[in-house]
Every structure is written in C-alpha cells, then in structure tokens.
Curated annotation (Swiss-Prot):
Belongs to the ZIP transporter (TC 2.A.5) family. ZupT subfamily. This is Zinc transporter ZupT. Keywords: Cell membrane, Ion transport, Iron, Membrane, Metal-binding, Transmembrane, Transmembrane helix, Transport, Zinc, Zinc transport. It comes from the Bacteria. One of its GO terms (molecular function) is zinc ion transmembrane transporter activity. GO terms for cellular component: plasma membrane. InterPro entries: ZIP, Zn_transptr_ZupT. Zn(2+) binds at residues 144, 169, 173. Its main location: membrane. The lineage of its organism: Bacteria, Pseudomonadati, Verrucomicrobiota, Verrucomicrobiia, Verrucomicrobiales. NCBIfam families: PRK04201.1 (NF003243). The chain crosses the membrane at residues 8-28, 40-60, 78-98, 131-151, 162-182, 192-212, 216-236, 250-270.
Amino acid sequence: MDLSADHILVVFLLTTLAGLATGIGGFIAFFMKRTDTKALTFALGLSGGVMVYISLVELLGEAQHRLMEFEGHTAGSWIAIASFFGGIAVAALIDYLVPEDENPHEARGPEDIHGQASGEFSSSRIKRSGILFALAIGIHNFPEGIATFAAGLDSLTLGTSIALAVAVHNIPEGIAVAVPLYYGTGSRKKALFYSFLSGLAEPVGAAIAMFFLFHFLTPTVLAVLFASVAGIMVFISFDELLPMAERWGHHHISIMGIIAGMLLMAIVLI
C-alpha cells in the first residue's frame, strides 16, 4: 500500500472526480430532447453493465481471493459472501428508509420525469423532490467514496477502475437530480449546483477514510469493504438503473447498453 503524500492526493482527486460526475449528468440534462429517450435508455443500461461487471468480476473476486489468503479457504469464502449480501442489505435498508415518491432508486419513466414539467405537480413539490433526490443519492454514494479511496491506496489500477464505474453510474443520477430541480425552480444554476452537491458524498467518504479509518484499513478490512461495496453497487444496478432503463420503453437498446458497459469494463480491467 502506497502511503506517500503524492499518491494519497492522486487517489483523493480521483475519488472526487468520480463523485462530481453527477454534475456532468446535470449538465447533459439541459440538452436532452424530451422525446428522445433512446440515449438515456442506453446510458442507464451502460451504467448498470459497468457496475454489475466490476462488482462481480473485480471487487467480489478480489475480496474473496484476499479473504481466502488471510482467513483460510472456508472462512474467507463465508466472510466474502456475508460481506457481499451485507452490502446488499445496507443498500436495501437505505432504500426502504427513503420515501418512495422521493427515492431516486425507484424506477422512473419519461412520464414521471418529464411529465413534471406539464403542470401535474406544483413547482415547490418538484423542487423538493429534486433536493431529496440529491440527498438520497449522496447517502448511497458515501460508502462508494470510502471504497474508491481505500482501493486506490492499495492499487491505483483497481481504484481507477472503481472510480470509472462510479463516474459512469453517477451521470444518470445527476440527470435525475437536475431535471426536477430545473422544472421546479427554472434555474439552471440551482439544478447544476445540487447535482454537483449530491456527488460530494464521494470525497467526503474519502476524507473520512483518510482521517478516521486510515489505521483500521488492514488487508482483511479492505477485502470486506470491497465485497460490501460490490453488494451495494449490484443492488443499485438491479433496483434502479436496469428497471429505469426498461421503463423508458427500449428493451433492446437497454440490453445493448448493458453489454457495452460490461465490454467497456472488461477492456479497462485487462
């Protein structure tokens, strides 16, 4: 594990850039045609494919390999399994605690997002939904920031791969924040501000890992963290990204996006 100041700074910046990709999504939202749902369908599928592939192939595989090395074959396998499904349970609990109407991880179609501009809801309610989307996304992204930073300290290659997956996943989440806020306030600046703000949970998680969890990041703890975040990312993909892609009405385009996302990460991880 490289603990030099330069390496730590590089990893922290990498984590920050991954989180701020929500702002890219917020920016893209202003240029999307409401009737063109194919691009977002593909993007959602791509995000899901990226996250599922890196979670199951890289993070969980790496966690299981390390745990088996340090804890023994049987114990290591069980710890990896428990950590993975523990991550799923944590993500599901967070999802349960956020009200359905304001949860960005409840599948939404064009009638839910763009329909808000037609006057079905008051501007104050739309604005409130956008702010709550940003808050909920921040809560979900917090452990990803810890994992990206910890992985980057251990291996810059692994940290970069996780950061790329998180960044790709954050772009459609930024869209989910920016669209209702833009419709509710009429201000592009506010929509962009909150979409960027929701991504700050990533560097906050990295900062906490750096200042408070640093001395506890043993090889076993790192492996447990990798497996847990793999579970969180798989849950987000199956609960949010893939169902939302389906609801936009282009099944085969979403499948192509998933395959493209998996292929992208397979090439990146070579």
